[in-house]
């Protein structure tokens, strides 16, 4: 029988199962309803016949048994799929555990870790279970015959202890290159192939069997029971990896089923702290850890605990109301709607759109302010600081002036008093001859005209008045 025929029969079987499921539920519900009504009428005394009541009771029992059996069968046949989902969840839990170790700068040991080794052993047990059953149904041939040497190495059992794997016998010095998480992912892929092969062989045997063989059916359910037990063991590995000792409740399982598409699991601060402390303890047992690494890891663990909010505050949403003052004006003013609380007067603002003339004037004044008046708002503060600095440096100024007069007097060979008289005479002579006249005053209009294109506003009276108000006194600039 070729592959196309097998797929066609599988599709036909699926269609028949979908079409007959509603019919089975309808028959079971009808039988249960008739039996319940008959028993109720018999108890009330309206029916005196005992035989119909007994038959109705038997029908009720049979209908209930069929319904429970159908539900149990439906749950058991999904064991393989649930086991694959549990393997993926366990892999995500182990990966999350490694992320916690990395977050506190602690390397999670890749070799001989109990959780990952336990997961690998359980996966190999599931593969062996499916391989054994496939051989019994397929004349001793399985996909195992196509194993490569690498796959045979990671799937083989130890010769010393059959509960251990062969890769666990590798010495620790040679085991640094062995990543057991990658081995676990490879084993999951191998199990998926064996599960597909086992499902195909079981369906072909049931379809080609001329008579109903109860032995094969019982063997099939026995295999599913073994796989279900392995699934529960993998679930315990997941809880151990995430430090969740209790099983999920019914509502939590529903939420977990809705969130199963998430790649990473959410952990609380307690689980993160427990994993971080366990990582520190494992590194302390090794000889390669230093005191600075442990101190840094403890500090990062403290930050994890401190970052958890004790009482999370609800986020206040701000309602925004958009109002248009004028239909012709495209400018929009955004106003935040309050929550009924008292608003200070300083917090109330009224915005009005600018006209075209105001915009032009504002742009020109902005250019002028950037060119000439930059930093003028802090001139008063700067003047105050400058005055304080002069007072502090006044003793140094007097001392330097005294030392300068002493040096000049020594250079000219005269007394300091005579040197002061000579300086006064030279000053008076310069004033009389006109050499000591003050230079031309600074013309700021010319400087403004030569600056960045603001000569159009150089003769503006408002602009000149504003400059005059911002002028600094000469006694400050000394």
Swiss-Prot record:
Membrane spanning residue stretches: 25-45, 53-73
Keywords: Membrane, Mitochondrion, Mitochondrion outer membrane, Transmembrane, Transmembrane helix
Spans within the Cytoplasmic topological domain: 1-24, 74-478
Documented effect of changing residue 130 to F: In oj35; reduces growth rate and results in vulval defects. Produces dead eggs at a restrictive temperature. Defective cell division and cytokinesis during embryogenesis
Predominant localisation class: mitochondrion
Annotated compartments: Mitochondrion; Mitochondrion outer membrane
Membrane-side (Extracellular) residue stretches: 46-52
Bilayer topology annotation: Multi-pass membrane protein
Biological processes, Gene Ontology terms: chromosome localization to nuclear envelope involved in homologous chromosome segregation; embryo development ending in birth or egg hatching; homologous chromosome pairing at meiosis; microtubule cytoskeleton organization; vulval development
Any one Gene Ontology cellular component term annotated for this protein: mitochondrial outer membrane
Function of the molecule: In the first mitotic division in embryos, required for mitotic spindle alignment and asymmetric cell division. Required for motor-driven chromosome movement and homolog searching within the nucleus, and subsequently ensures homologous chromosome pairing during the prophase stage of meiosis.
Record protein name field: Spindle defective protein 3
Highest classification ranks of the organism: Eukaryota, Metazoa, Ecdysozoa, Nematoda, Chromadorea
């Amino acid at each position: 029988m070729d592959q196309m025929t097998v797929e066609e029969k599988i599709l036909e079987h699926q269609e028949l199962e979908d079409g007959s499921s509603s019919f089975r539920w309808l028959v079971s519900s009808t039988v249960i309803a008739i039996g319940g009504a008959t028993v109720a009428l018999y108890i009330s005394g309206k029916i005196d016949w005992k035989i119909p009541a007994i038959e109705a009771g038997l029908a009720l029992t049979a209908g209930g048994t069929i319904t429970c059996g159908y539900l149990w069968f439906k749950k058991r046949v999904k064991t393989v799929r649930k086991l694959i989902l549990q393997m993926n969840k366990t892999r995500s839990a182990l990966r999350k555990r490694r992320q916690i170790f990395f977050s506190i700068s602690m390397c999670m040991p890749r070799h001989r870790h109990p959780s990952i080794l336990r997961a690998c052993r359980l996966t190999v047990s599931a593969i062996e279970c499916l391989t054994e059953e496939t051989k019994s149904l397929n004349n001793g041939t399985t996909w195992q015959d196509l194993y490569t040497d690498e796959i045979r190495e990671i799937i083989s059992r130890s010769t010393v202890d059959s509960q251990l794997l062969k890769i666990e016998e590798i010495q620790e010095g040679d085991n640094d290159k062995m990543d057991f998480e990658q081995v676990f992912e490879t084993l999951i892929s191998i199990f998926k192939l064996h599960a597909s092969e086992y499902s195909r062989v079981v369906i072909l045997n049931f379809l080609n069997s001329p008579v109903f063989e109860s032995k094969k059916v019982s063997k099939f359910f026995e295999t599913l029971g073994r796989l279900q037990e392995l699934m529960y063991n993998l679930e315990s590995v997941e809880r151990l990896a995430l430090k969740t000792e209790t099983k999920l409740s019914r509502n939590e399982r529903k939420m977990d089923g809705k969130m199963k598409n998430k790649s990473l699991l959410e952990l609380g601060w307690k689980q993160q702290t427990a994993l971080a402390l366990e990582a520190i303890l494992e590194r302390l047992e090794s000889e390669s850890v230093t005191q600075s690494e442990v101190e840094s890891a403890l500090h990062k663990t403290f930050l994890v605990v401190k970052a958890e909010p004790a009482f999370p505050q609800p986020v206040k949403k701000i309602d925004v109301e958009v109002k248009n003052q004028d239909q012709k004006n495209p400018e929009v003013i955004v106003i935040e709607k309050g929550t009924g609380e008292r608003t200070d007067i300083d917090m109330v603002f009224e915005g009005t759109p600018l006209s075209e003339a105001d915009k032009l004037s504002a742009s020109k004044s902005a250019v002028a302010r950037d060119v000439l008046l930059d930093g003028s708002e802090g001139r008063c503060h700067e003047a105050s600081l400058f005055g304080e600095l002069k007072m502090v440096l006044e003793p140094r100024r007097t001392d330097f002036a005294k030392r300068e007069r002493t040096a000049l007097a020594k250079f000219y060979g005269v007394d300091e008093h005579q040197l002061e008289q000579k300086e006064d005479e030279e000053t008076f002579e310069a004033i009389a001859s006109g050499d000591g006249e003050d230079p031309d005053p600074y013309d700021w209009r010319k400087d403004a005209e030569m600056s960045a294109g603001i000569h159009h506003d150089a003769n503006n009276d408002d602009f000149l008045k504003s400059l005059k108000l911002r002028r600094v006194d000469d006694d400050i600039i000394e």
